[in-house]
Structures are given as structure tokens and as C-alpha cells.
């Protein structure tokens, strides 16, 4: 039998991500700087609830994640009718694109998170890429490229550059897009780990019906393996997404972990404090290594420009049990960029010493 499929699927190439599995090395002793997770990992309260809830695995999960949505309402101040959860932020990205953007025009600044492009391609979108290391430096030009009856994607803070747009700048983009009947999809998965002022637009979803804000518990609470994300938007958008959402996509352990995690606000505060301190440590030391240049960052990772080949450097560091993110597969970057997560001082010190030794 000859199997036929849509051309968008036949030509689709999955996005390459960080992490030990992507690097093909599961050695538990490796210090993973390639995944941008909270430097203090998972809260102890989450570990505890996961153990106590194992007996409930015999039952189906709550189809509507009722208790988690209720908890998110208290955590964010957003009404339950304006919230939806997913099996990680990724599920929500793909559901949004397939539901609202089929064959439409989208604007994607690059370099940025690759799944916006991937999901848009599967939805047969016409993509305009806007190359910039910082949208704020090309702001008016970027706004002029917003399509009609389409969508603009913004990662804020941006992965992998670490740049962040202000709430005022984002509001201007939202208004410009609204005049063109376009969505604005803002990914705030890293915004809770920004030590400085809060530039979130989460509370604007009731004011602007073209705004869609994505969040994740993965980064802030160290829950990468559990897969739990959420989004906020107008009730109309959320109601439509609920209709096409895969049943039971958010499992019981994910729901329970999320409920407990968002009660632990001190975890976020501690993470921010470490990130602020360790960013200064890493940048000051790495910038002093010949042919290494750190970009400024608002959040828990740093993009670094290097003279040597990024893949070769990644292999060298793996010999020292250190995994970094090779950024050559980010559209808009090349094999002279790497990204590192900000981790504990002990881990950061190890990275600096090894880089100084091998460079």
C-alpha cells in the first residue's frame, strides 16, 4: 500500500532541542547546561506529592484539569474561563496553529524558539522571518511587517538571545496587530525567571481579544519531564481550543504537580536571586576568555558568540561531563553560537574552569 500524506508532513523535520536525550548521552553524571531549567530544580513539595499520588494512577485523569485551572486562577489572577492547560507548552502551540492559523500569514522574528516555525509549517502557513538579535532595536520595522489576518509570534524573554520587550512595546504590537485583524502569540515561558521588573502581558488578555499568552511550569519549577503548560486568552479562543484538545492529554501526576508547584512562590523568588547573582559571575568570567562573547540576558540562560566551531566545542565539553546547547540549528544563527543555562554556583564554576582550560 502506498501511503500518502500532506506535503507539509512529508517535508517536515522535527525541531532539535537541548537535553541529554537530544545529545544522545544519558550519562547521569553530566551537568546539563543545554536545558533552561530553574537552577534549584523541582520544589520538595512537588517531589512529595508525586510519591503520595502514585496510587491514583489506576484512575483516568480529570479531563478538564479542574483543580489545576482553579489553582492557576489564584496564581495568575486570570479567570478560569480564560485559561487552558496542556501537555507542556508545545501541545498548546500546535493546537493554536492548527486551529487558528491554517494557510495564514505569520511573522516570526529569528533567532527564536523553533517550534513556532514548525507548527506554522504543519498548518501550511506562509512565514515571514524577521532577522534580528533584538526586536527593540528594529521595532518600527518589525511592526510594519505584521501581516493582515494572520499572527505574529514573540518569545518574551526570547530564547536563545535572552532579550526582553517592555509591556509598553508589546502593547503597541498588540494594537498594531489588532488593527490588521491579526493574533499576537506571546510566549512567556521564561518570564517568571526574570530577576528585574515584570513585563508580562498576561493581565491584558481580557482587554485584547487578539492576544494569546503562553506559560509553562517546566522552567520555573523544574518540571521538564512532567510536561505541564498553560495559556491565557479571550473566552472565545479558549472555548474553541477546548473543543479540539486531545482528551486526557494532561495526566494525573502533571496536574497534581502543577497544583502544588504554583503554591510555592518562594521557589520563584529564590531562583531569581540565584539567576541574578550567577549571571554576573558567568558573564564576567566567560567574557574574559579569549574569543568568547556573552550577550546580555534578562533571564536564566546566556547566548555566547565563539570563534571556534560550536559542535566541536560541545564535544570537547562532553569529555568533561558538561553539556551545552549548540545553537547552529537556530534559524538566524550559525556554528559560532552556543547557549548555556544559569545553574548553581558549583556547576557554573566547573563550566568556567573547564572553558578556561580548553580554550
State where each predicted segment sits:
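N-terminal "arm"/small-domain region of PLP-dependent enzymes with the aminotransferase-like
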Residues: 1-59, 148
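PLP-dependent aminotransferase-like
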Residues: 9, 98-154
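Conserved PLP cofactor-binding pocket of PLP-dependent enzymes
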Residues: 12-16, 296-297, 304, 320-342
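PLP-dependent aminotransferase class I/II
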Residues: 64, 210-295
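Phosphate-binding glycine-rich loop
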Residues: 65-105
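Active-site phosphate-binding strand-loop segment of PLP-dependent enzymes
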Residues: 133-195, 303
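PLP-dependent enzyme catalytic core of the Aspartate aminotransferase-like
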Residues: 168, 319-320, 331-359
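Conserved PLP-binding catalytic core of the aspartate aminotransferase-like
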Residues: 275-276, 289-320
Amino acid at each position: 500500500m502506498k501511503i500518502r500524506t500532506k506535503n507539509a508532513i512529508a517535508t517536515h523535520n522535527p525541531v532539535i532541542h537541548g537535553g541529554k536525550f537530544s545529545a544522545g548521552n544519558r550519562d547521569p553524571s553530566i551537568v546539563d547546561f543545554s536545558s533552561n531549567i530553574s537552577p534549584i530544580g523541582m520544589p520538595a513539595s512537588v517531589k512529595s506529592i508525586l510519591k503520595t499520588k502514585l496510587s491514583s494512577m489506576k484512575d483516568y485523569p480529570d479531563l478538564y484539569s479542574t483543580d489545576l485551572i482553579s489553582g492557576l486562577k489564584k496564581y495568575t489572577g486570570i479567570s478560569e474561563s480564560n485559561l487552558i492547560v496542556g501537555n507542556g507548552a508545545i501541545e498548546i502551540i500546535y493546537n493554536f496553529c492548527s486551529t487558528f492559523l491554517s494557510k495564514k500569514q505569520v511573522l516570526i522574528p529569528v533567532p527564536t524558539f523553533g517550534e513556532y516555525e514548525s507548527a506554522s509549517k504543519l498548518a501550511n502557513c506562509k512565514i515571514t522571518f524577521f532577522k534580528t538579535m533584538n526586536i527593540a532595536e528594529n521595532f518600527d520595522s518589525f511592526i510594519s511587517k505584521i501581516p493582515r489576518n494572520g499572527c505574529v509570534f514573540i518569545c518574551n524573554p526570547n530564547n536563545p538571545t535572552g532579550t526582553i520587550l517592555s509591556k509598553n512595546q508589546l502593547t503597541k504590537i498588540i494594537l498594531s496587530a489588532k488593527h490588521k485583524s491579526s493574533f499576537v502569540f506571546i510566549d512567556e515561558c521564561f518570564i517568571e525567571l526574570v530577576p528585574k521588573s515584570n513585563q508580562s502581558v498576561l493581565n491584558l488578555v481580557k482587554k485584547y481579544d487578539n492576544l494569546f499568552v503562553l506559560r509553562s511550569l517546566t522552567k520555573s519549577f523544574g518540571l521538564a519531564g512532567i510536561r505541564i503548560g498553560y495559556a491565557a486568552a479571550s473566552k472565545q479562543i479558549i472555548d474553541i481550543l477546548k473543543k479540539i484538545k486531545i482528551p486526557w492529554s494532561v495526566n494525573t501526576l502533571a496536574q497534581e504537580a502543577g497544583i502544588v508547584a504554583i503554591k510555592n512562590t518562594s521557589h520563584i523568588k529564590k531562583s531569581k536571586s540565584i539567576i541574578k547573582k550567577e549571571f554576573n559571575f558567568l558573564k564576567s568570567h566567560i567574557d574574559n576568555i579569549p574569543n568568547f562573547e556573552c550577550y546580555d540576558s534578562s533571564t536564566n540562560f546566556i547566548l555566547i558568540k565563539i570563534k571556534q566551531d560550536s559542535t566541536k566545542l560541545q564535544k570537547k565539553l562532553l569529555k568533561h561531563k558538561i553539556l551545552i546547547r549548540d545553537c547552529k540549528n537556530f534559524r538566524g544563527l550559525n556554528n559560532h553560537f552556543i547557549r548555556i543555562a544559569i545553574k548553581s554556583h558549583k556547576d557554573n564554576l566547573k563550566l568556567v574552569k573547564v572553558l578556561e582550560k580548553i580554550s
